[in-house]
């Protein structure tokens, strides 16, 4: 029973992506430790000691003389879920090695009452972020279809939104696929077919890391776009190619550099360990930079908006435009990484519980919020949907009399309506580009 709890806890704590079943991954790591033990024992001179060096399927024991006690730390393979550090020992007797003492599970802390609460916490977190990513994926897909279907919605702003939606969708897909592989309980394991199949695991991790980084950089692009909209003289549509290079290009270069450092410095396992600091910083530093830059853009945008809203030269329609933009910006920019600033400066392990709740639970619903704000609450989108709905209603049987009635009622005012239409001006570029909500 305890062994199953240990394995379950180990599987839940494999938060990095892997294309190998967790139980097979567990056995593969055991095999790696066994290989290291064999190499270590072969290099040691036993000198006909009473107890030869041995691998007991969990720990490596060096040669010893009769009466000698050998003490080793808890096995490294279980280090992901130690509740406390501990040691285990064996005595060398005339009959050979004694049983391990103290009890392996007790010594390494697996019977700690906190373990069950931790497992419950991880199960709850997984359920929440699975729901969040699923709902986000459905809402983002719906929003993308809506924007693509209506030609009047095709503009630079919405093209950027579509790329942001795609980055959120890829992020959700990578997480859901990763979990379906890691936590699948169906089928019979065939671990003997998988030793050495680290290539697929590494490719999955590369895809996962790329989706995460691309998502951060498209959030940065949204911040850059809003900032450019406020300060630039030229239309920001001319910067769209640069936005594409930032959103998809920079993550590609950074992931390529990370792969190179992994291959040269830490090409071990599934690339989900961080024993060497350089590969870890190569993948983490670009994300930290995007978070900091986006936070700086947020501060700058708020400052510019406050200046424009309090300026005596701004009045009437312009002021309402800036108020609408202020509402949109203040709702959206905090989603673009401001909450990540809370944990960006903290080392790994500090306030890990709160960080998990923010990044997994809150972050999983981020795509849903962005889809609602950028698409479903967008006045242009709502107008197009209403227009399409009215068109569908008019094509239904029984609507002919309604159309004739509407035509006769509108004919009397057609000339005045035409005059109003001719006298109206086209909306300004700023108004058309900032009608987010």
Curated annotation (Swiss-Prot):
How does the record describe its quaternary structure?
A: Interacts with ADCYAP1/PACAP (via N-terminal extracellular domain); activated by PACAP27 and CAPAC38 neuropeptides. Interacts with VIP; the interaction results in VIPR1 activation.
Q: What is the lineage of its organism?
A: Eukaryota, Metazoa, Chordata, Craniata, Vertebrata
Provide the protein name: Vasoactive intestinal polypeptide receptor 2
Sorted keywords for this record are:
Cell membrane, Disulfide bond, G-protein coupled receptor, Glycoprotein, Membrane, Receptor, Signal, Transducer, Transmembrane, Transmembrane helix
Which of this chain's residues carry glycans?
57, 87, 91
**Topological domain ranges for the Extracellular compartment:** 23-123, 180-202, 261-279, 346-353
- Xref: InterPro entries: GPCR_2, GPCR_2-like_7TM, GPCR_2_extracell_dom_sf, GPCR_2_extracellular_dom, GPCR_2_secretin-like, GPCR_2_secretin-like_CS, GPCR_2_VIP_rcpt, GPCR_2_VIP_rcpt_2
The region annotated as signal peptide is: 1-22
Function field:
G protein-coupled receptor activated by the neuropeptides vasoactive intestinal peptide (VIP) and pituitary adenylate cyclase-activating polypeptide (ADCYAP1/PACAP). Binds VIP and both PACAP27 and PACAP38 bioactive peptides with the order of ligand affinity of VIP = PACAP38 > PACAP27. Ligand binding causes a conformation change that triggers signaling via guanine nucleotide-binding proteins (G proteins) and modulates the activity of downstream effectors. Activates cAMP-dependent pathway. May be coupled to phospholipase C.
For this protein, the record's Gene3D superfamilies field holds:
GPCR, family 2, extracellular hormone receptor domain (4.10.1240.10), Rhodopsin 7-helix transmembrane proteins (1.20.1070.10)
Q: Does the keyword Disulfide bond apply?
A: yes
Localization recorded for this chain is: Cell membrane
* GO cellular component labels: plasma membrane
> Belongs to which family?
Belongs to the G-protein coupled receptor 2 family.
Molecular function GO terms recorded? G protein-coupled peptide receptor activity; peptide hormone binding; pituitary adenylate cyclase-activating polypeptide receptor activity; vasoactive intestinal polypeptide receptor activity
Question: Cytoplasmic side: which ranges?
Answer: 150-157, 228-238, 304-324, 378-437
* SUPFAM superfamilies associated with the record: Family A G protein-coupled receptor-like, Hormone receptor domain
Transmembrane ranges?
124-149, 158-179, 203-227, 239-260, 280-303, 325-345, 354-377
Instruction: Name one process (GO BP) from the record.
Output: adenylate cyclase-modulating G protein-coupled receptor signaling pathway
Topology of this chain in the membrane: Multi-pass membrane protein
Q: Which cysteines are joined by disulfide bonds?
A: 37-60, 51-92, 74-108, 201-270
Question: What's the source species for this entry?
Answer: Rattus norvegicus (Rat)
| Tissue specificity comment | Mainly in the thalamus, hippocampus and in the suprachiasmatic nucleus.
């Amino acid at each position: 029973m305890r062994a199953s709890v240990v394995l379950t806890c180990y599987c839940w704590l494999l938060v990095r992506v892997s294309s190998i079943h967790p139980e097979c991954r567990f056995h593969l790591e055991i095999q790696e430790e066994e290989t290291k033990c064999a190499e270590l024992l072969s290099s040691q001179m036993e000198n006909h000691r009473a107890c030869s060096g041995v691998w007991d399927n969990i720990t490596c024991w060096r040669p010893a003389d009769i009466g000698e006690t050998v003490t080793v730390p808890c096995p490294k393979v279980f280090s992901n879920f130690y509740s406390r550090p501990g040691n285990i020992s064996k005595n060398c007797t005339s009959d050979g090695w004694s049983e391990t003492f103290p009890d392996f599970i007790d010594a390494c802390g697996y019977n700690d009452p906190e373990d069950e609460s931790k497992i419950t916490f991880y199960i709850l977190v997984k359920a929440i972020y699975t729901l969040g990513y699923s709902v986000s994926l459905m809402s983002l897909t719906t929003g993308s279809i809506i924007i693509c279907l209506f030609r009047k919605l095709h503009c630079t702003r919405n093209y950027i939104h579509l790329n942001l939606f795609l980055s959120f969708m890829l992020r959700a897909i990578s997480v859901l696929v990763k979990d379906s592989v890691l936590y699948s309980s169906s089928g019979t394991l065939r671990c003997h077919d998988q030793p050495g199949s680290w290539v697929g695991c590494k490719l999955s991790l590369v895809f996962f890391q790329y989706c995460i980084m691309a998502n951060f950089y498209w959030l940065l692009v949204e911040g850059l776009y809003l900032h450019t909209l406020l300060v630039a003289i030229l239309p920001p549509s001319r910067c769209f190619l640069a936005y594409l290079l930032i959103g998809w290009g920079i993550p590609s270069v950074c992931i390529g550099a990370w792969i190179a450092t992994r291959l040269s410095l830490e090409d071990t396992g599934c690339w989900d360990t961080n024993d060497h600091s350089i590969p870890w910083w190569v993948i983490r530093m670009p994300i930290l930079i995007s978070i900091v830059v986006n936070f700086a853009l947020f501060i700058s945008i708020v400052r510019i908006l406050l200046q424009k809203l309090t300026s005596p030269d701004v009045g009437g329609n312009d002021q309402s435009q800036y108020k609408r933009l202020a509402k949109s910006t203040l709702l959206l920019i905090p989603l673009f990484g401001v909450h990540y600033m809370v944990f960006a400066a903290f080392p790994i392990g500090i306030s890990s519980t709160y960080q998990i709740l923010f990044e997994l639970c809150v972050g999983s619903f981020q795509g849903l919020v962005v889809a609602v704000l950028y698409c479903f609450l967008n006045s242009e989108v709502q107008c197009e949907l209403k227009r399409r709905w009215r068109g569908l209603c008019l094509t239904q049987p029984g609507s002919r009399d309604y159309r004739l009635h509407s035509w006769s009622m509108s004919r009397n005012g057609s000339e005045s309506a035409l005059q109003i239409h001719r006298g109206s001006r086209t909306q300004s570029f700023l108004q058309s580009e900032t009608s987010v909500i």
